[in-house]
Amino acid sequence: MLKTFNSSARSCRAMPRFLPTLCSRLHEKSGFEIRNAVRMHSVGSHTHTHDHGSDKEMLELVKALKKEGKSPELKLAWLGLYSNIGLAAAKGIGGVALQSSILVADAAHQLGDTLSDLVTLATLKICSKKPTQKYPAGFGKWETIGTFTVSGLLVAVSVGIAHSSLSRLYTILFPYAGSEHTHIGHSHNPSQLLFEHPFMALGLIFGSVVLKEWLFRKTRTVAQKTDSNILLANAWHHRADALTGMVSLLALSGTYFLNAPWLDPFFGCLVSIVVFSAGFNSSKKAFLQLLDRAPSEELRIAVTDALLKGEKLPYKIVTILGNAHAMHVIISVPPSFTSQQSSELAQKVEKTVLDAIPALSSCIVTPLSSDSNQVHRWQHLNGSSGEHSHPSHEHTH
């Protein structure tokens, strides 16, 4: 009987974490639930199904990075990153050696998390640079480019996992018809190696579950002591990894102990669908950002809240463009204002926004006369006479 051990890990991982361990999912409330950590995202953004790299997550991440390099939050964040690297390497080597789709897929998933973390840190460093003569609008789009690259890589990986899993599932269900296609992936029966060393594969998955659960408990304890929302979200993500690892462990156990080799490629197909969905949604969001789509509501709220708390000045916000690193705010000023008054007002608005949002490296403020055609066009697009005004206006969440 053909026992093709081809599973793809993390079958039920409802959210391949696109957004980085460090940029782990934030919730507006203080209570984080597992469903918030594992609901699928985006990265359509994050899907919100998860808005990958959501602006709120990026703003929180920058706040964390502003702290001392030896802060407990950053220590645990880096520990989580290192654990992903180690688990990805161990599962990848084990999956290839044992011809196990579950381990290979799990390793690919872990690698996706790691790449997202690394790209986030790298692009954050680039985006934090001040505008230059060559790049007067700043380097904010580097984050979008990095997201698009990693998302595209995950889409490609998911397609490869799906192709391998479907081929092996077909071989198991139709052994005679599939025998002529056994050259796809590997030329020998992968189940042989697995069934000779079953506890090696099970041990790798079990070890990852234990490590992730330990990280969850350790991270949650520090998060509660330091009142860190981003660290608490990260803790629940470790718990979600541990729970989904248990599903992979059950799939591996069923394949071996119940003599059900179809479980391996079947779960591999499920994982590939989840990874593809997350990658596609993240790519879509990044692509739309490159086309200068309007910023997310959470970023717009962050800007308007900053201005509401600032000095009361005679202007209205016409529109907000950009992302969490570089922003363009267009305001309308009274027609009686001179060019010098408008320029001074714009500088005050710019300083207020930059002081309130540490993630921003660039904020361009353009003042327009309230009776100008440009303002009327923007108001028509926004469907209102202005987003917010000073000094008399209301703002609700």
Swiss-Prot record:
Listed GO MF terms: iron ion transmembrane transporter activity; monoatomic cation transmembrane transporter activity
Domain of life: Eukaryota
Residues in the signal sequence: none
Alphabetized Pfam families for the sequence: Cation_efflux
InterPro entries (UniProt xref): Cation_efflux, Cation_efflux_TMD_sf, CDF_Transporter
UniProt organism field: Schizosaccharomyces pombe (strain 972 / ATCC 24843)
Gene Ontology biological-process annotations: inorganic ion homeostasis; intracellular monoatomic cation homeostasis; iron import into the mitochondrion
Membrane topology field: Multi-pass membrane protein
PANTHER family according to UniProt: MITOCHONDRIAL METAL TRANSPORTER 1-RELATED (PTHR43840:SF15)
Family: Belongs to the cation diffusion facilitator (CDF) transporter (TC 2.A.4) family. SLC30A subfamily.
One GO location term (cellular component): membrane
Keywords recorded for this protein, A-Z: Ion transport, Membrane, Transmembrane, Transmembrane helix, Transport
Chief place of localization: membrane
Compartment annotation: Membrane
Membrane-spanning intervals of the chain: 142-162, 191-211, 242-258, 260-280
Keyword Transport in record: yes
Protein name: Uncharacterized metal transporter C1020.03
Keyword flag Ion transport: yes
Intrachain S-S bonds: none
